[in-house]
From Swiss-Prot:
One of its GO terms (cellular component) is extracellular region. The RxLR-dEER motif acts to carry the protein into the host cell cytoplasm through binding to cell surface phosphatidylinositol-3-phosphate. It comes from Plasmopara viticola (Downy mildew of grapevine). This is Secreted RxLR effector protein 48. Transmembrane segments: none annotated. Residues 1-27 form the signal peptide. Keywords: Host cytoplasm, Host nucleus, Secreted, Signal, Virulence. Secreted effector that completely suppresses the host cell death induced by cell death-inducing proteins. InterPro entries: Methyltransf_16 (IPR019410), SAM-dependent_MTases_sf (IPR029063).
């Protein structure tokens, strides 16, 4: 799902947390939004996969092409780089994705401002299911979820769903206030059997 442009305060907070995780992983990242994934690549992530719904994939690829110069590292190791792939949220779509790309390991899953019921409805259920399936396929992976709190945003419903309906655990890592005076939060999600940091 295409996510709205997100506040730069959130972006900076999110990237600082991401960079601390990046230092302790193997740099294989899956992202459902172009900007955070491109920022991760510029920050040095080795292999980044940007995912989007089929109908928005062309725009994502145009953005990648427009930013190719800054996204390409001088020395590319085997299977490094940044690519865009189709992925819609939900069990069926995620299973199809994993059937095709399941050999690629994921260390970090980034999700930025993808939960907002007035715009996306209850698609957060499919998002939670997708996160769980990606983590089950990559048991040591973590999800970094950045959200902006707004009226009736659905974030509390998402977190309750994650807690009751998935094998994921979550904790809130960061809270700050954005330029629109909304609370910006970053959550860390992982499978139950992974040690908490």
């Amino acid at each position: 799902m295409c996510c709205v442009s997100w506040n730069w305060v959130l972006a900076c907070t999110f990237l600082l947390i991401f960079l601390s995780w990046w230092n302790c992983c193997n740099d294989r990242i899956s992202v459902n939004s172009g900007v955070p994934g491109m920022a991760a690549r510029v920050a040095g992530a080795h292999h980044v996969v940007l995912t989007e719904q089929d109908e928005l994939l062309r725009l994502l690829r145009v953005n990648l092409a427009a930013n190719a110069e800054v996204l390409t590292h001088e020395i590319e190791e085997e299977k490094g780089g940044i690519v865009a792939r189709p992925l819609s949220w939900g069990i069926e779509h995620t299973k199809e994705y994993l059937a095709r790309y399941g050999d690629e390991k994921i260390d970090v899953i980034l999700s930025c401002d993808c939960i907002y019921e007035p715009l996306y409805g209850t698609s957060w259920k499919g998002l939670a299911q997708t996160m769980e399936l990606l983590c089950l396929a990559n048991p040591k992976s973590v999800v970094l979820l950045a959200v902006e709190r707004r009226n009736e945003d659905g974030i509390d419903k998402f977190l309750a769903f994650v807690e009751k309906e998935t094998m994921l655990l979550y904790r809130r890592d960061e809270v700050t206030v954005g330029s629109s005076k909304n609370r910006l939060e970053v959550y860390h999600l992982h499978l139950e059997n992974i040690l908490k940091n």
